[in-house]
Amino acid sequence: GVVIVTSRFERRAAGLYHNTAVVMEKDGTIAGKYRKMHIPDDPAYYEKFYFTPGDLGFHPIDTSVGRLGVQVCWDQWYPEGARLMALQGAELLIYPTAIGYESSDLPEEQERQREAWTTVQRGHAVANGLPVIAVNRTGHEPDPSGQTNGIQFWGSTFVCGPQGEFLYRAPKDEEVVEVIDVDMQR
């Protein structure tokens, strides 16, 4: 069996919703969940109209494969969550993500943003001595408001070891299914 980390649109109460990562154990039970704390307010991202910041704090989730420090998307830009998870015994940091370029960004700016995204998460690995799995969406999503040409998600899912070394890098523009062995004893 496998442990699965997935995202969902969670209704906590009438009119109160969260972008939530759910961790499912090998037997299908829910091991835990994490509600996204940082809600972006950038062009073509409209999460602030749907989601409330999380209220569960930063706590690792115990599973049969280890203690997982799970955060969602934009949370990856802030070092505090990774550090708090590590200090509480997380053995692996996982970031399910949907991030990309706003359509009007120049190619050079697009690449700088993507590289910054990779660098900050590799920094979490190095600073905390933990492997990181960053899973990102790929493809295009039009802007329903018509204010921009939408978001081109930059893919580039990756896995890195505790020294920030790449164990796997996916392409920018295609969906892939890959199994990566991560040495949790390092």
Functional labels for PLM-detected ranges:
Residues 11-16, 148-152:
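Short loop/turn motifs at secondary-structure junctions and domain boundaries
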Residues 185-186:
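A short C-terminal boundary segment appended to hydrolase-like catalytic domains
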Residues 22-24, 158, 178-180:
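Conserved hydrophobic/aromatic positions in well-ordered beta-strands
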Residues 7, 20, 33, 169-171, ...:
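Residue-level detector of high-confidence beta-strand sites
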Residues 4-7, 11-12:
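Flexible, acidic active-site loops/lids enriched in D/E/S/T/G that coordinate Mg2+ and/or position polar
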Residues 12-123:
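Active-site catalytic loop in hydrolytic enzyme cores
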Residues 1-5, 73-177:
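CN hydrolase (nitrilase-like) catalytic-core segments centered on the catalytic cysteine
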